[in-house]
């Protein structure tokens, strides 16, 4: 009898494990080369880490050039991918992790009629915004591993926060 109960428990556990493997994955960040968006050549971000390493390469193996401190503002020249941003540090091209960045607010307009999802794209209600609607960009969506998902812009529209497809925005 004990053997039968153990087998039932193992079978149930295996089934639950497979269910977890086949459940819907979190949204994956689109590679930057797949996104057509008019972004400013550089934009300001705030560091949200005690100390953030500044590296020579866009990976954890790059040599550390120094650090930037929490609440310090940095100009991002470009995003290498969802996880790394290129900046200038002491006159040199350098890289920081996007996992510890918060975008400063900036203005944008919708380029066409577009959906505004609140509270999230996955679980939100869509409201249609007409072309030329002004919004404040507060940040980006997040990738599965915590970097930026540039497919989505996190915006404020009339005091309500939600998400709009980045491709439908013209940044100023």
Swiss-Prot record:
Stated name of the protein: Uncharacterized protein YfhK
Source taxonomy: Bacteria, Bacillati, Bacillota, Bacilli, Bacillales
PANTHER family named among the record's database cross-references: CELL WALL-BINDING PROTEIN YWSB, FAMILY PROTEIN, PUTATIVE-RELATED
SMART domains from the UniProt entry: SH3b
Keywords: Signal
Native source organism of the sequence: Bacillus subtilis (strain 168)
InterPro entries: Cell_Wall_Dynamics_Protein (IPR052354), SH3-like_bac-type (IPR003646)
Superkingdom of origin organism: Bacteria
Span of the signal peptide: 1-29
Domain SH3b: from-to ranges: 42-105, 112-172
């Amino acid at each position: 009898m004990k053997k039968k109960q153990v087998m039932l428990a193992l079978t149930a556990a295996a089934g639950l494990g497979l269910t977890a493997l086949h459940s819907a994955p979190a949204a994956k960040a689109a590679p930057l080369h797949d996104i057509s968006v008019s972004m400013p050549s550089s934009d300001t971000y705030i560091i949200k880490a005690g100390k953030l390493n500044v590296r020579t390469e866009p990976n954890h193996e790059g040599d550390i050039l120094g650090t930037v401190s929490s609440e310090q503002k940095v100009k991002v020249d470009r995003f290498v991918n969802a996880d790394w941003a290129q900046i200038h540090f002491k006159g040199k091209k350098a890289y920081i992790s996007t996992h510890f960045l918060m975008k400063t607010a900036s203005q944008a307009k919708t380029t066409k009629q577009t959906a505004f999802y609140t509270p999230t794209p996955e679980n939100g209600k869509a409201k249609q915004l007409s072309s030329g609607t002004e919004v404040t960009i507060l940040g980006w969506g997040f990738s599965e591993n915590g970097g930026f998902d540039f497919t989505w812009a996190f915006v404020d529209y009339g005091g309500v926060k939600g998400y709009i497809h980045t491709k439908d925005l013209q940044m100023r």
